[in-house]
Design a protein with these regions (language model features):
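Pro/Thr/Ser/Gly-rich low-complexity, intrinsically disordered linker/stalk tracts
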Residues: 390-424, 471, 489-501
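Extracytoplasmic
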Residues: 35-37, 57, 516-521, 533-537, ...
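Extracellular acidic, Ser/Thr/Pro-rich low-complexity tracts
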Residues: 421-426, 483, 526-532, 545, ...
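Recognizes extended acidic, P/S/T-rich segments that occur
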Residues: 429-470
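Substrate-binding cleft of secreted/luminal carbohydrate-active enzymes
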Residues: 305-391
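Active-site mouth of glycoside hydrolases
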Residues: 26-274, 278-286, 297-302, 313, ...
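Beta-strand-rich modules
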Residues: 469-485
Length: 730
């Protein structure tokens, strides 16, 4: 198609799609990003970038809710759409910390477990058997706003279409619409490939409901990527896909979204502008030398991009990032690099988060030295900001701008005050007043919202002091954000009437227990409190007797006690919230010893049981059979029913810890223990090196002999290796 006719067609499609919408607003960008040989250009200026990869600007995996049990994959999560304020905040955080471009994750594809998990997706099944997939309008309006915010704030976007994997639904789920297989996605005569091309057409020709522009006219869209980690990309697949994208989006760039290699056929394809690679340890390419190796393979024929790398210590990430910044082969350099991965502020306070199988957490901007210390968060954020500055010709990163005002959320309680943090705020001060205009008193200083594993069901950013408030009075609150560059203007003001009167803790305790002198007794109390005047509740056990009762831990709700003589004992448990307290008493009847008493009623270290002491149950399989390796680890528990069983001893009935020596060398996984034929106790194991590590699992055992099974039970996943177990009590 000739260029002029093509442009006329684009204009006609745009007008038809707008359907009477308001005229398109003017873009905040002057130019589309273009390619000049192996270099990206913004007008006549070289365009390079570094950042932290933000996969979820358009769809959020809400890890705080945990896995969806209705999804048999085990790790299936809950997802939701971000709010417009969240998208604005996240993009602002990136831009204000130096980002110029960002790659997001793919368009999600409907799959069979979505309904049970309440998940919505971007791509819906066709309405007829041989029809084309449909775009979910609700999802695409969120996508519209992401693009509009990126344009408004000056962030270029790389947008991949379909995933090789099934995390969000990918090629396998697309193929399932047509009763084809995942590999048919790469076969250009398949129904799946035809559907893939139609999804591309629908997306690129969509009119943005926020800007009024067709997607192919959005300057914020730097490039379309064929997909995420499409490692089986072949020449025909790429040739047809890239040409199809260029047909509909002639002003935007095309990325070959392959993985682990540079495709030689991509280098000669006239419609491919950028070749990309992802660096990860499991791909054996997560090192600085990969940059030069790939640049040599590209040979200056295309732009080269490191679309993802990460899950390494900060010093190793910095070595790779500095290689991206400085490596040069015959004048060609990498256009950019993105470290995996970012999560942003929640609408109602705190941050979203994600934990990888390696134990690494997502990074929060602008970085939190204390809260993110174990994750080396501040070091990672700083190395990325430094790289972005170097790519812009500067030696050091610019200071952060002063933060904008946070957004204080309405509440009905002065003990549950939350706000959406400022994009680059590091800490916050909370002020209270008796009137909406002040005078204001600071009641909370240097509060951080950068805590990892934030749970909105159980956590709040600020609780006022109960002792300073009067019941029935109305109080007013506002918040200011701070960072090293200054303080924000105050937030909006909210009013709260204090109507919560402190109540004493409610204690639950069995009224009577029976034991013998040689066994001792396990004491288990529970309590509930209203969280007033604070969430701190002191607990303790007492016996007003003659010293014949001994507690292992008198300051814990669950502990053990033993007795120097038979008799009847009244043991009292108390929960004290600081103003009010409650107590309950259990009567323990202690008979004479029926066996030998243990030397220590509180501590126990049993035998270490290796896999040689266990009994194996091996399921028949053509591959990955359960076996003991030369390193002494048993694995990989690849088939449901694979298990190892031990007979272990316990000195008394009650709670113990199981020291498990395991190896998670191939990534995180989920396996289960079964004690004495009970229900499987599921355990999430992190990734380790080949030496393995220990994990402590709480178990309930009976006095004497117990059977402990470990294996792959229903719902378990991943390859696992185990070496030994040991029963302990401390």
């Amino acid at each position: 198609m000739k260029p002029m006719k093509n442009l006329l067609l684009m204009g006609l499609l745009s007008a038809l799609a707008a359907g009477g919408a308001l005229a398109a607003e003017r873009s905040h960008f002057t130019h589309f990003i273009t390619r000049d040989g192996a270099t990206l250009k913004d007008g006549d200026k070289v365009f390079r970038f570094a950042g932290i990869h933000a996969p979820e600007l358009h769809r959020i995996e809400d890890d705080a809710r945990g896995p969806c049990r209705a999804d048999p994959r085990g790790w299936g999560q809950y997802f939701k759409w971000p709010t417009a304020q969240e998208q604005q905040n996240w993009i602002q955080a990136m831009v204000q910390t130096g980002a110029k471009a960002q790659r997001v994750y793919v368009l999600s594809v409907q799959q069979e477990f979505d309904k049970a998990c309440g998940r919505e997706t971007h791509i819906l099944a066709p309405e007829t058997a041989d029809g084309m997939p449909r775009l979910n309008e609700k999802a695409m309006r969120v996508y519209d706003n992401m693009i509009a915010e990126a344009d408004k704030q000056g962030l270029r976007l790389i947008l991949p279409f379909i995933d090789h994997w099934w995390w969000w639904g990918g090629r396998e789920q697309l193929a399932a619409f047509y009763h084809e297989k995942a590999e048919d996605f790469y076969r250009t005569d398949s129904k799946t490939f035809k559907a893939y091309l139609d999804v591309i057409r629908q997306v690129i020709t969509r009119t943005n409901t926020v800007t009024g522009r067709a997607y192919y006219d959005e300057k914020a869209i730097m490039a379309w990527e064929t997909g995420n980690e499409l490692e089986d990309t072949n020449a025909d697949f790429l040739h047809q896909t890239a040409a199809w994208i260029k047909k509909w989006a002639p002003h935007q760039l095309v990325v070959d979204g392959t993985y682990k290699k540079i495709n030689s056929f991509a280098l000669t394809d006239p419609n491919v502008d950028i070749v990309s690679n992802h660096y990860y340890t499991n791909a054996d390419n997560n090192h600085p030398g990969q940059v030069t190796q790939d640049l040599r393979a590209v040979g200056g024929q295309k732009v080269y991009l490191v679309g993802e790398f990460g899950l390494l210590p900060a010093d190793q990430l910095n070595a790779i990032m500095q290689s991206i910044v400085h490596s040069e082969v015959n004048g060609a350099q990498a256009a950019g690099g993105l470290i995996w991965g970012f999560r942003g502020h929640r609408h109602d306070g705190g941050f979203y988060w994600h934990k990888e199988s390696t134990g690494h957490y997502s990074y929060h901007l602008p970085g939190f030295a204390k809260e993110g210390e174990a994750n080396q968060e501040q070091a990672v954020v700083d190395l990325v900001r430094t790289a972005a500055a170097q790519m812009a010709g500067q030696q050091t990163m610019a200071p952060l701008p002063k933060p904008d005002a946070p957004l204080l959320r309405e509440t009905t309680s002065p003990f549950a005050i939350n706000w959406m943090g400022a994009a680059v705020g590091r800490s916050y001060d909370v002020e209270r007043a008796a009137s909406p205009t002040g005078p204001w008193t600071v009641v909370g200083r240097d509060i951080s919202d950068g805590v990892n594993e934030w749970n909105p069901e159980t956590m709040v950013l600020f609780r006022d002091d109960y002792r300073q408030l009067q019941l029935g009075h109305t109080y007013y609150y506002r918040v200011t954000a701070k960072n090293e560059s200054g303080r924000s203007a105050p937030s909006n003001v909210i009013s709260v009437q204090h109507s919560e009167e402190n109540q004493p803790p409610v204690v639950t305790l069995e009224p009577a227990l029976t034991t013998t002198q040689d066994q001792g007794v396990e004491l288990t109390a529970s309590w509930q409190d209203d969280g007033l005047p604070s969430r701190e509740v002191k607990v303790g056990w007492q016996h007003a007797g003659d010293g014949q009762v001994h507690f292992c831990h008198a300051d814990r709700a669950q502990t053990r006690a033993w007795f120097t003589a038979p008799g009847t004992y009244a043991l009292t448990f108390t929960a004290d919230d600081g103003l009010l307290k409650s107590s309950k008493t259990v009567t323990v009847t202690v008979g004479e010893a029926t066996g030998k008493a243990p030397a220590d009623f509180c501590r126990y270290h049993g035998e270490v049981y290796g896999v040689a002491e266990g009994r194996l149950t091996v399921m028949k399989s053509d591959k990955d059979a359960l076996t003991v390796g030369e390193d002494g680890f048993l694995g990989p528990f690849a088939n449901e029913g694979d298990k190892v069983s031990w007979q272990v001893q316990a000195p008394w009935s009650g709670q113990f810890l199981l020291n498990v020596t395991f190896n998670g060398k191939w990534g995180g996984k989920q396996n289960s223990f079964v004690v004495n034929g009970g229900a499987p106790q599921t355990v999430a194991f992190p990734q380790t090196d080949e030496q393995g590590q220990q994990l402590r699992i709480p178990v309930t055992l009976k006095a004497g002999s117990n059977q402990i099974d470990f294996g792959r039970f229903a719902g378990d996943w991943g390859y696992m290796f185990i070496k030994s177990i040991e029963v302990v009590a401390e």
